[in-house]
Amino acid sequence: MRRDINNFLFGERMELFEILKQKIKEKEVITPKEMAIIDDNAEFLGIQKILLMENAGKAVYEEIKDIDAEEFIIFCGTGNNGGDGFVVARHLGKGDVILIGKESEIKTYEARENFKILKNLAEFGNIRIREIKWAEEVNDIFERLKNKKAVIIDAMIGTGVKGELREPFKTIVDKINELKQINKNIFVISVDVETGHLESDLTITFHKRKTINKDNAIVKKIGIPKEAEYIVGWGDLKALRKRDSNSHKGQNGKVLIIGGSKDFYGAPILAGLAALKIVDLVGILSVGKVIDKVNHPEFIMYRVEGDYLSSQHVDYTLEIAKKYDVVVLGNGLGANNRTKAFLNEFLAKYDGKVVIDADAIKVIDYNNFEFSENYIFTPHKREFEYMGIDLDNIENIKSTIVLKGKYDIIFNANNLKINKTGNAGLTKGGTGDVLAGLIGALFAVNEAFLSACCGAFINGYAGDLLLKEKGYYYTPLDLIEKIPNVLKIFQ
């Protein structure tokens, strides 16, 4: 089972990453959320969004430039989808640009810059710009097109918009659909994705096909490198669920730390303190010798008797775990027969979310073990070797694995990423406990793979901030205090 791993585990980390790239099938179709992450991570790698917008608009132009049409009408929203439409209009050098909204409402720098260029070109008369609030303001255009050969470009709403169409978009879409029924010489092209129930003849999408694209979509490359799909960057952090300003206690996550023993009491405390920076409630379940050492009133404490957690504590632990969104398991647990019995029985009976770290990784019975999608493992290289993962059957690994190291490799059966934040200061004891608590906190309200990626990034970036301030001379507690700084920078 371990033959694949033994060949590379202690070699170059990138060698493992390349092997995983071969084993994990690349996605041909991605979700809008995944595309947004890739788009932002391309910027993280240094590719400006205004360049991607230029490439997207130019790709649409190249597809339509030879169409024989009397008129080109480009409906643009105030987001980056509209920005793509502005670029299309510039390359066409003619047509009517209908901005649904006001110039002051254009949301991004790159879209605003492209609109400014259009305004300058409009002074020459070939491009006409109209800002509208209501669909009725373009009735004259629809009337004019009833007997003309025309191309209508839909750059109204991109992949980031959900729910029912609001006005005036709904009525504009209805009018375009009605026009197509009257005049068969109307050709409708959507940019990236169709707006609502619009009956497009062609959709030109970018980089990869999206799950919401219809069969008429074609894919155009716009200069996003493969690395943007694999790197963990600020795009991942932006995808995390945002805290609702109207939420109340408990709605932003509840984490239970299960660990500690007579030998190690600091590990669960560090994990708990890291989690508390993000979620609403943190509980610690441990033996009395750990609980007695905790001097943090922020925690909810659950005490059991003995030197180690053991099978006699399973039923009580299961009852407590039901109150929480996620369990972080293993920090300071100790690796012996008692903890092994406890952990394997607990996992067999508990079906919630679990972050499995440290000693918990060592005492799992991996014979016939099911790598559930509810699990995130956070091993270092020796613990990873112990897990005995067979890369030839990686499709069975539904759990997310965070292989810690100079570069963190995060993967499961369907996903693979690499995190390059962090430095040698993170080799100190306790920093792994911080990471486990951090990932657990994110996992409370987000999906497993995103939580693992973001936890690794935040932990490493916090270390990078400390490296600038203190060199390598920082502690796990210093690391915890930097977590909010990282989140404020990137969210």
UniProtKB/Swiss-Prot annotation:
Region listing for NAD(P)H-hydrate epimerase, in residue ranges: 1-230
Chain positions covered by the region annotation NADPHX 2: 380-386
Pfam family, one: YjeF_N
Domain YjeF C-terminal: 232-490
Family, as annotated: In the N-terminal section; belongs to the NnrE/AIBP family. In the C-terminal section; belongs to the NnrD/CARKD family.
Gene3D superfamilies noted in UniProt: 3.40.1190.20, YjeF N-terminal domain (3.40.50.10260)
Required cofactor(s): K(+)
Positions contributing to ADP binding: 404-408, 423-432
EC numbers, comma separated: 4.2.1.136, 5.1.99.6
Function according to Swiss-Prot or TrEMBL: Bifunctional enzyme that catalyzes the epimerization of the S- and R-forms of NAD(P)HX and the dehydration of the S-form of NAD(P)HX at the expense of ADP, which is converted to AMP. This allows the repair of both epimers of NAD(P)HX, a damaged form of NAD(P)H that is a result of enzymatic or heat-dependent hydration.
Catalytic activity: (6S)-NADHX + ADP = AMP + phosphate + NADH + H(+); (6S)-NADPHX + ADP = AMP + phosphate + NADPH + H(+); (6R)-NADHX = (6S)-NADHX; (6R)-NADPHX = (6S)-NADPHX
Matching NCBIfam families: yjeF_cterm (TIGR00196), yjeF_nterm (TIGR00197)
Designated name of the protein: Bifunctional NAD(P)H-hydrate repair enzyme Nnr
Binding site for K(+): 81, 154, 195
Gene this protein is translated from: nnr
PANTHER family in the record: ATP-DEPENDENT (S)-NAD(P)H-HYDRATE DEHYDRATASE (PTHR12592:SF0), ATP-DEPENDENT (S)-NAD(P)H-HYDRATE DEHYDRATASE FAMILY MEMBER (PTHR12592)
GO annotation, biological process: metabolite repair; nicotinamide nucleotide metabolic process
Organism of origin: Methanocaldococcus jannaschii (strain ATCC 43067 / DSM 2661 / JAL-1 / JCM 10045 / NBRC 100440) (Methanococcus jannaschii)
InterPro entries the UniProt entry points to: Carbohydrate_kinase_pred_CS, CARKD, Nnr, Ribokinase-like, YjeF_N_dom, YjeF_N_dom_sf
Disulfide bonds: none
GO molecular function: ADP-dependent NAD(P)H-hydrate dehydratase activity; ATP binding; metal ion binding; NAD(P)HX epimerase activity
Entry keyword set: ATP-binding, Isomerase, Lyase, Metal-binding, Multifunctional enzyme, NAD, NADP, Nucleotide-binding, Potassium
Top-rank lineage group of the source organism: Archaea
ADP-dependent (S)-NAD(P)H-hydrate dehydratase: annotated segments: 232-491
Domain YjeF N-terminal: 35-230
Cofactor binding mode and count: Binds 1 potassium ion per subunit.
Binding site for (6S)-NADPHX 2: 332, 433
Region (NADPHX 1): 80-84, 158-164
